[in-house]
């Protein structure tokens, strides 16, 4: 049966042992489909039904640069004092972007999750003067490509394409960082914690408290008190 006419549903697992002729068996999509879908969303290019269009071929060329990598929680991906080497497309999991002081103190700047693409936004991070680190918060499935090859492929596709692509993430990170700093200086910690619960419920469920505390700008003991106080109000 042509996939166009196949319902996009699957039968309940409890029916699978019955060998019922009405059971709908869905073919598992290859891993590369997740990569192509992710690139399609990031670049705003529709692939299905447009496979021969130049933009679709561009995505296919980009996809060839990536390989899949599965990592455990707390796997270091990029480290300070070394040029940032790769671009990452997150299929599953959460990554954190942070700086680490010589005394070991951590300052978390950003979290990235499913569907996000992570790469060295700042020119300095592509040199040995890099001060940023990237580590997995949870087990993660990633698509990884060499950053220089990735940038070169985009630049060769059209003049001005790389600056417009790069600007989107740069602006997003700058806006989120400035807003977080503004809140840190103008709002008490309980209000900032409440906004964290409202705006990032998925992070609160999946990211360890000590990392959320650093992102919120409080010490772990304060974060624990905020968490206990908020839970008491809800009960």
PLM feature segments, named:
Residues 1-201, 206, 210-221, 227-235:
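Cytosolic regulatory regions built on CNB/CRP/Popeye-like sensor folds
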């Amino acid at each position: 049966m042509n996939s166009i006419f196949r319902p996009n549903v699957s039968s309940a697992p409890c029916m699978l042992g019955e060998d019922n002729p009405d059971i709908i068996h869905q073919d598992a999509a290859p891993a590369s489909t997740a990569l192509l879908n992710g690139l399609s969303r990031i670049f705003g290019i529709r692939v299905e039904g447009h496979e021969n269009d130049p933009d679709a071929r561009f995505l296919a060329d980009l996809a060839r640069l990536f390989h899949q990598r599965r990592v455990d929680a707390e796997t270091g991906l990029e480290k300070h004092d070394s040029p940032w080497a790769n671009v990452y497309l997150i299929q599953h999991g959460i990554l954190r972007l942070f700086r680490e002081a010589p005394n070991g103190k951590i300052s978390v700047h950003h979290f990235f999750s499913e569907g996000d693409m992570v790469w060295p936004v700042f020119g300095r991070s592509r040199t040995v003067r890099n001060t940023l680190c990237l580590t997995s918060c949870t087990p993660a499935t990633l698509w990884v490509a060499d950053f220089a090859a990735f940038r070169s492929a985009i630049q060769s596709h059209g003049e001005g394409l790389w600056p417009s692509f790069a600007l989107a993430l740069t602006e997003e990170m700058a806006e989120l960082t400035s807003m977080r700093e503004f809140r840190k200086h103008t709002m008490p910690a309980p209000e900032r914690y409440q906004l964290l619960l409202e705006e990032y419920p998925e992070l609160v469920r999946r990211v360890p408290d000590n990392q959320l505390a650093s992102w919120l700008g409080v010490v772990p003991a304060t974060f624990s008190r905020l968490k206990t106080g908020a839970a008491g109000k809800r009960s």
